[in-house]
Amino acid sequence: MATAAKTLAAKTDTAVRVRRVQAADIPHVIGLDTRVTKLAKAEYWNDVFRRYGKLRLHERFFLVAENRTDKAKPRVLGFIIGEIRAWEFGSTPCGWVFALSVEPEMRLHGIGSALFEAISSEFKKAGVSKMRTMVARDAPLQLLFFRSEGMMAGPYIQLEKDLD
């Protein structure tokens, strides 16, 4: 199932098109992630593209917000990645978002919301009615964003253990 590209006018003068990732986008995704996280992870992103940009596309979604007009801004203004997961700890099939990033200078312009809306639509078309993500406790900006999109605490508690 192909994701229909959707062109929208974000709250800027930049026309944005949300579409599936392409191989030519990966250097831009790597650059955006490196600028935001201050960590270079090219091997990781190439692997994510291989798994989420090429395989099982009916249940995996790697979408980018493409800059359509402003040559002074980066080509990829943001991305979102998710997949349909089923039966983990008894959960019925649901959409999981595990990555979302927007160019820092383009935040608060509707790009993150456009990406979130696009992946929500893909999950819905694939037949799931619930969407989940995880947010670090010390990431209030991310928490506020996801809450502004209608997400709230779910029925699961994340647990972890150091393995040293």
Predicted regions and their residues:
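Conserved active-site alpha-helix within GNAT-family acetyltransferase domains
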Residues: 113, 125, 137-155
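Conserved beta-strand in the GNAT
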Residues: 73-84, 96, 101
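Active-site rim helix/loop that mediates acceptor-substrate recognition in acyltransferases
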Residues: 40-62, 68
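Conserved acetyl-CoA-binding loop-helix of GNAT-fold acetyltransferases
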Residues: 108-121, 148
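Conserved GNAT acetyl-CoA-binding A-motif
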Residues: 123-135
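A short beta-loop-alpha structural element at the N-terminal edge
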Residues: 16-29
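Conserved beta-hairpin
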Residues: 60-80
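A conserved beta-turn-beta hairpin within the catalytic core of GNAT-like acetyltransferases
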Residues: 85-97, 107, 154
